[in-house]
Curated annotation (Swiss-Prot):
The keyword Signal does not apply. Its EC number is 2.7.8.13. InterPro entries: Glycosyl_transferase_4 (IPR000715), PNAcMuramoyl-5peptid_Trfase (IPR003524), PNAcMuramoyl-5peptid_Trfase_CS (IPR018480). This is Phospho-N-acetylmuramoyl-pentapeptide-transferase. Keywords: Cell cycle, Cell division, Cell inner membrane, Cell membrane, Cell shape, Cell wall biogenesis/degradation, Magnesium, Membrane, Metal-binding, Peptidoglycan synthesis, Transferase, Transmembrane, Transmembrane helix. The gene is mraY. GO terms for biological process: cell division; cell wall organization; peptidoglycan biosynthetic process; regulation of cell shape. It comes from Burkholderia cenocepacia (strain HI2424).
């Protein structure tokens, strides 16, 4: 919004040229989202408390968590407000990548909000059924996947609908250019061609998988938000490089016109996340809830797809991956042993993984900070793929 205004008035006030610089707008998006979160946080927490949307705590979990019962949840709304305002203020609203990421983020946020609302307001412990939740996630994920298959493959001024119709007329056999290939880290001249169908399938699983992985990680005070901020900031760097014809050529990456604008979104997400951490740090005054976790995970997955860094997301989001695998292995092993021995057995003391470490003697803050450190290391490792190719 401010970019369009600055471009319109630039002839009358040359200092407004500053608003056209991507890095300046990224910094301002961070500050804006951070400021909104810090200022609006107490009001949002009061409103959530008045709505009596207190978090229910599992009685079979760590006993130290029982004191958290009643802490307001659905605080992810605060994050989404910061992201929306900062992105709309400082982003280029003619950029289609901005809008598709916003659509996925807020679409998944609505799913999470409905799930949270049913749990804490209607007192339905199940919330949305797994089938219902995955159905709506799949609807949004598949729409984004089809849209991005033709958005990423061409320049920003080509109509996506025209490309889609060309694919249909080709008998669904039209290929995609090299910039839409699956990029392999550390290999500068080797990529895996996906084709339209491969791109859609991969994108669907990345977006929906990332959303649910972040949601599973959200279980301790401050645990998930800092990894989201770190991974989001790292993806913002990739977006800046891929969107720049100069830097992408120098670093031997395919140039994706318009992708650089995602730096604004990632910066807004980082600022909003840090503001939320102010109130979510131990002992938490508010929890994120599904409304925040599903939305942020979907956002990370979508940005990673646009900048063609799905494998790097898997690396940098190693904590999310480990938490998800711990749940899958725990459930699978329990079912297998129950069928084979007549008694279900556990691989871990409790899943997800962070609860296993708590029950093994780690304090909550130790688990959180150590997971932060691991994520920082993984993000730095992921960023090395920019140069080590």
């Amino acid at each position: 919004m401010l970019l369009a205004l600055a471009q319109w008035l630039q002839g009358d006030a040359s200092f407004l040229r500053l608003f056209t610089y991507l890095t300046f707008r990224a910094v301002m998006a961070t500050i804006t989202a951070l400021g909104i979160g810090l200022v609006c946080g107490p009001w949002v927490i009061r409103k959530l408390t008045q709505m009596k949307v207190g978090q229910a705590v599992r009685k079979d979990g760590p006993q130290t968590h029982l004191v958290k019962s009643g802490t307001p949840t659905m605080g992810g709304v605060l994050i989404l407000i910061g992201i929306a305002v900062a992105t709309l203020l400082w982003g280029d609203l003619t950029n289609r990548f901005i809008w598709i990421v916003m659509l996925v983020t807020f679409g998944f946020g609505v799913i999470g909000w409905v799930d949270d609302y049913r749990k804490v307001v209607h007192k339905d412990p199940r919330g949305m059924s797994s089938r219902e939740k995955y159905f709506w996630q799949s609807v949004i994920g598949l729409f984004a996947a089809v849209y991005l298959a033709f958005s990423v493959s061409e320049a920003n001024n080509v109509r996506v609908f025209d490309l889609f119709m060309a694919w249909v007329r080709s008998g669904l056999s039209m290929g995609l250019p090299a910039r839409a290939d699956l990029m392999l880290p550390f290999l500068k001249s080797i990529s895996y061609p996906l084709g339209v169908w491969g791109f859609i399938v991969l994108t669907y699983f990345v977006i929906v998988g990332a959303s649910n992985a972040v949601n599973l990680t959200d279980g301790l005070d401050g645990l998930v938000i800092m990894p989201v901020v770190l991974v989001g900031a790292s993806l913002g760097v990739f977006a800046y490089v891929m969107g720049s014809a100069v830097y992408s050529k120098y670093l031997l990456f395919p140039h994706i016109p318009g992708a650089g604008e995602l730096l604004i979104f990632c910066s807004a997400m980082g600022g909003a996340g840090l503001a939320f951490l102010w109130y979510n740090t131990h002992p938490a005054q508010v929890f994120m809830g599904d409304v925040g976790a599903l939305a942020l995970g979907g956002a990370l997955g979508t940005v990673a797809v646009i900048v063609r860094q799905e494998i790097v997301l898997f690396i940098m989001g190693g904590i999310f991956v480990a938490e998800t695998l711990s749940v899958m292995l725990q459930v699978s092993w329990f079912k297998y042993t129950k069928k084979r021995y007549g008694e279900g057995r556990r691989l871990l003391k409790m899943a997800p993984l962070h609860h296993h470490f708590e029950l093994s003697g780690w304090k909550e803050t130790q688990v959180v900070v150590r997971f932060w450190i691991i994520t920082l290391m993984l993000c730095l490792f992921g960023l090395t793929t920019l140069k080590l190719r």
